[in-house]
Amino acid sequence: MADFDYETFDYSDGLDENGYWSGIKALDYVTLPEDFGSIALKESDLTPTEDELQQQMDSLLNQYTASQPVTGRAAQSGDVANIDYTGTVDGVAFTGGTATGYDLTLGSGTFIDGFEDQIIGHNVGDTFDVTVTFPDGYGDSTDAEGNTITLSGKEAVFSVTLNSLSESVTPELTDEWVESNFGISDGLHTADQLRSYFSDALYANNYDNAIVDYLMANSTFKELPAEITSYYIRMFLNHYNQYATAYSMDLNAFAQTQGYTSADAMLAASDAYFEHLTKQDLIFQAVAEAKSLAPTQEELDDANSTYADTYGENRAHLNALQACVLDWLEENATVA
């Protein structure tokens, strides 16, 4: 982990203005299958199954869940508990350990391990203690006078009052619900129309995946350029370091909350992921090199307006290049 400068990571690092990896000729690293320009796919592999379609519909409905108060029972996993809490370590209150009217989804893992579990089973109006242990590496805090309080590895006691409970209710898929939510914006008026819309979207996604999977399985690679693999390692570490910082942890402490012994162990477990991303980028660039493909200015402008503010122009141009390559591959593929 120490070998990678992840704190200053920039999404456009190592990319040129064309969306290519700077100084890298992809065709020197990957040999594409002879039929890459005429990939044959099976219709049965692209058509979504009923299970896939139902998962999409369920996911959509879950986005429209509404909250309603819970009465007459104790707190359960999945409930949103509105709580007041005050935390102490060795009997001393610490900064960041007190809140009023905080909404906490039980079972979400938002708080320190064990905190949410100890709320489950309590009723609205209860006041009780929750005892947890901060993970090793957890950042220090201060007391009311500004004195440092060490939290790493320390036991903390939180006095918690359960103010209220609420639960999410998922709507049913009906023509009326579709009309109300998608009639004007998307021109969808019935449940059958909505299902057809998602079926088409899944088919298109399966098409994309089938093309990429075929090329990944049938291309041969020499050694992978360290510049690309390092880029994705730095991106990975930067991403999780932001989470760790938000919770006043270092990367090692955060990795432990994810079930790893250290950040290096978390990194090692992701080696195949970094290799996959590197190979995929090489394939897209190799096709672009072999067929002299490039996005239009309009496509570059669209990519810039969507991605450049967050990822920089060069990364936006890589996205546009890969979309251009995928379009070409799909136009030249056959489905039977």
Predicted regions, residues:
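FKBP-type peptidyl-prolyl cis-trans isomerases
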Residues: 1-336
